[in-house]
A protein has these predicted regions:
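Short, solvent-exposed amphipathic alpha-helical segments in soluble enzyme
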Residues: 25-31, 79-84, 165-169, 224, ...
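Residue-level signal for inorganic ion chemistry
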Residues: 15, 65, 102-104, 152, ...
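Acidic, proline/glycine-enriched N-terminal capping motif
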Residues: 1-53, 57-60
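Glycine-rich, small/acidic residue-mixed loop/short-helix segments
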Residues: 179, 201-207, 211-217, 221-303
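Acidic, low-complexity central loop/insert segments
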Residues: 2-5, 9-10, 55, 59-186
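Anionic-ligand-binding alpha/beta catalytic cores of soluble enzymes and soluble regulatory domains
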Residues: 145-233
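Short amphipathic beta-strand starts and helix->beta connectors
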Residues: 39-53, 83-86, 131-139, 250-254
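Short, surface-exposed ligand-recognition loops at beta-strand->loop->(often short) alpha-helix junctions
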Residues: 12-18, 31-32, 102-108, 236-243
């Protein structure tokens, strides 16, 4: 397996009302998750547009929110606008924690040797809290690259000891991003899809339609009932495709590209441009490939 440091920020929620409060803020059904457990979740505007994407970890004594680097402070400000009488405390723990992603095993299997070093049991719960010497680790089976890997959260003071224990080849974050794009997995921050609807950029799997009210829920329910979004997530294949470019056809805006890895880029594209269509992307030509049959549903699970 390979090891990659994930640029991160994070929040910790404590207090007796933490679960009810967070349940009303996000798209996933956190109350249905096991303890310990993890759900991917979106935080939407009242218009249903994506503001934040996070992995939410449910632990016995707190809730841990893992976000991309630089996102925690803004989400903390949002929370504090809504905390009135709720008994909830929000703590930014970005500076004390590190996150590693262990990935790249053939066939997507978890290395038993690595799992044993971490005291992680692959045949048991997806998310586990383990003790290794003086270290307490939060570990979850997690698909960032099209195959299952392990996401490991550790206190910074134990990071060097963990790296020495694992003794794995390190890969840069860009390698994880390239694998993600090729696997057709959307990342709203890296791909520039913040401000868009989840259903239009491959993130509907992070939306639960079984839970109660939350910010943006009315729009999500309306879209589920009518199914009338105008865009979908696709993969474009060509040569030297640019990142974060507005796409036009016949003088009309038809979508936007996400993060490019050269010959492949994900794009939010109007539905009338069907699978196999050819599209001009900057100075290059690209072919549209529908992702509806290739996206791995286990990459997102909102309960």
């Amino acid at each position: 397996m390979y090891l990659t440091h994930i640029p991160s920020s994070s929040l910790r929620l404590t207090g007796p009302d933490r679960l009810d409060f967070l349940q009303g803020q996000m798209t996933a059904h956190l109350k249905a998750a096991p303890t310990p457990g993890r759900v991917p979740a979106l935080f939407l505007s009242v218009k249903g547009q994506i503001e934040f994407f996070a992995q939410i970890y449910k632990r016995p004594d707190d809730l841990y929110l893992h976000l991309a680097a630089g996102q925690a402070e803004a989400l903390e400000r949002r929370f504090k606008k809504y905390i009135i009488f709720d008994q909830v405390e929000v703590q930014n723990v970005s500076s004390v924690l590190s996150t590693l992603h262990l990935w790249g095993e053939m066939g997507g299997e978890i290395s038993l040797e690595v799992a044993q070093k971490l005291n992680y049991s692959p045949e048991e719960a997806e998310t586990q809290i383990t003790d290794v010497g003086e270290m307490t680790l939060l570990i979850s089976r997690f698909n960032r690259t099209g195959q299952s890997g392990l996401e490991v959260h550790v206190l910074n003071k134990h990071l060097d000891a963990l790296l020495e224990l694992l003794a794995l080849e390190e890969k840069p974050y860009s390698a994880v991003q390239e694998a993600r794009v090729r696997a057709g997995i959307s990342d709203p921050l890296e791909d520039g899809f913040l401000g868009d609807l989840p259903q239009e950029c491959g993130l509907e799997g992070a939306v639960s339609y079984k839970k109660g009210c939350y910010i943006g829920q009315e729009i999500m329910a309306r879209l589920e009932a009518r199914g009338n979004t105008r865009h979908r997530l696709v993969r474009l294949e060509g040569q030297n495709l640019p990142s974060h470019l507005e796409l036009e056809q016949g003088g009309k805006k038809v979508g936007q590209t996400g993060l490019s890895v050269g010959n492949v880029v994900l794009a939010r594209l109007r539905k009338e441009l069907e699978d196999g269509a050819t599209l001009e992307v900057g100075s290059s030509s690209a072919t549209v490939h529908d992702l509806s049959s290739t996206l791995n549903p286990s990459a997102l699970r909102a309960f």
